[in-house]
């Protein structure tokens, strides 16, 4: 065991990149369409077995849309038998009462459903799918019926942030226990669409104020609903402790078996191992990919001598790569970073008007076009 390396307590199983929606802020890789060789049911069983033996306690099922996998109930049952706390992150598309019942029987602990907006028309436009809002709404009712905690997630951006009060009202109508109002994090398709998604600072201040007003109102009513407001680091002056540090507690397995220290790391010019070829233990403790940004030896001067390095762990490596071209550079979010001007530029661009029509939607046709053209901007196509 490598000295000083902790346990991979949190396993994220990205079961598939397939999805019924086309959200333009999806964090999946732009070239996801070329990654089709998904792990089999038995291969996922083996991943869960190894992770549990290593000390993992929480298992998240995500995608893409994990409900596309017809073996999801089997995977949940196996994870439950191993003693994992299991969480399903879903759009609600493909969910039915029968599947909710089967997932309950399999031992699933937690379901988180995402919405795009409180307004059905805007919700479906952002999802690139007709009747998505109607399906999500009905599934929320059923999730509550089967005694799951009602956890709702809204990715907040410039096109829905001004609905923040209506979003919260919708969540209360659905008897949500927890609501995550997460300002868009700019990875994958969201980074491609950043100019059209990043809210202005004025929008952000207003949304946070309204959220705080609702918190006070709910507290006065002794209402159990918890509102979580996640500010984008693009409006911070200090970087986030991304994943609580590279290779510290978080282990992601992509649909094709690639092992990653975070779900966005696939884009980095690093050769990450595959669970089909190496054990999880070897990957976690010995692989170059997982050791690359552990500790502080990799940090540039300025970061290495910073008193905050043990709190933010140097910030986000993927963000440094996307904005500067080098994952070893100081996170541009940091006000001390020599690359902070990239963040200031993004803030300035948020003041430019942008319509939904300018967004590039996440679907196979756009992904294939991007893959062929590499870094050439793709023509926006919305699948019918």
Curated annotation (Swiss-Prot):
Coiled coil: none
Catalyzed chemical reaction(s): [PQQ precursor protein] + S-adenosyl-L-methionine = E-Y cross-linked-[PQQ precursor protein] + 5'-deoxyadenosine + L-methionine + H(+)
Domain Radical SAM core: 5-220
Family annotation (SUPFAM superfamilies): Radical SAM enzymes
Cofactor note: Binds 1 [4Fe-4S] cluster. The cluster is coordinated with 3 cysteines and an exchangeable S-adenosyl-L-methionine.
Disulfide links within the chain: none
InterPro entries attached to this UniProt entry: 4Fe4S-binding_SPASM_dom, Aldolase_TIM, Elp3/MiaA/NifB-like_rSAM, PQQ_synth_PqqE_bac, PqqE-like, Radical_SAM_PqqE_MftC-like, rSAM
SMART domains for the chain: Elp3
Gene3D superfamilies (UniProt xref): Aldolase class I
Obligatory cofactor(s): [4Fe-4S] cluster
Pathway the protein takes part in: Cofactor biosynthesis; pyrroloquinoline quinone biosynthesis
Classification via Pfam families: Fer4_12, Radical_SAM, SPASM
Gene Ontology BP terms: pyrroloquinoline quinone biosynthetic process
Binding of [4Fe-4S] cluster, residues: 19, 23, 26
Similarity comment: Belongs to the radical SAM superfamily. PqqE family.
Quaternary structure, from the entry: Interacts with PqqD. The interaction is necessary for activity of PqqE.
Entry function: Catalyzes the cross-linking of a glutamate residue and a tyrosine residue in the PqqA protein as part of the biosynthesis of pyrroloquinoline quinone (PQQ).
HAMAP family (UniProt xref): PqqE (MF_00660)
Name of protein: PqqA peptide cyclase
Organism per entry: Acinetobacter baumannii (strain SDF)
């Amino acid at each position: 065991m490598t000295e000083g390396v902790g346990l991979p307590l949190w396993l994220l199983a990205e079961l598939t990149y397939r999805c019924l929606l086309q959200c333009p802020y999806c964090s999946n890789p732009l070239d996801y369409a070329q990654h089709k060789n998904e792990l089999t049911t038995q291969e996922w069983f083996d991943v869960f077995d190894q992770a549990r033996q290593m000390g993992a306690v929480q298992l998240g099922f995500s995608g893409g849309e994990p409900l596309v996998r017809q073996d999801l109930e089997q995977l949940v049952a196996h994870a439950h038998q191993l003693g994992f706390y299991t969480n399903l992150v879903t759009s609600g598309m493909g969910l039915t009462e029968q599947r909710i019942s089967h997932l309950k029987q399999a031992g699933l602990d937690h379901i988180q459903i995402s919405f795009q907006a409180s307004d059905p028309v805007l919700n479906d436009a952002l999802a690139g799918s007709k009747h998505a809002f109607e399906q999500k709404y009905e599934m929320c009712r059923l999730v509550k019926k089967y005694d799951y905690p009602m956890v709702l997630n809204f990715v907040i951006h410039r096109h829905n942030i001004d609905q923040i009060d209506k979003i919260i009202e919708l969540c209360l109508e659905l008897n949500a226990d927890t609501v995550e109002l997460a300002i868009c994090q700019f990875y994958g398709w969201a980074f491609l669409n950043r100019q059209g998604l990043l809210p202005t600072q004025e929008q952000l201040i207003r949304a946070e104020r309204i959220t705080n007003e609702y918190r006070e109102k709910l507290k006065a009513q002794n209402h159990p609903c918890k509102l979580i407001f996640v500010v984008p680091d693009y409006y911070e002056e200090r970087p986030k402790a991304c994943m609580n540090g590279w290779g510290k507690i978080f282990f992601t397995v992509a649909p094709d078996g690639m092992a990653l220290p975070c779900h966005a790391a696939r884009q980095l010019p690093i050769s990450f191992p595959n669970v089909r070829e190496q054990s999880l233990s070897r990957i976690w403790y010995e692989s170059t990919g997982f050791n690359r940004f552990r500790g502080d030896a990799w940090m540039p001067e300025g970061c290495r001598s910073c008193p905050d390095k043990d709190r933010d762990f140097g910030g986000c490596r993927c963000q440094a790569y996307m904005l500067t071209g080098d994952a070893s550079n100081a996170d541009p979010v940091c006000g001390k970073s020599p690359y902070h001007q990239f963040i200031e530029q993004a803030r300035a661009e948020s003041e430019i008007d942008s319509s939904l029509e300018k967004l590039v939607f996440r679907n196979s046709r756009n992904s294939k076009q991007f893959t062929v053209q590499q870094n050439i901007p793709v023509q926006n196509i919305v699948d019918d």
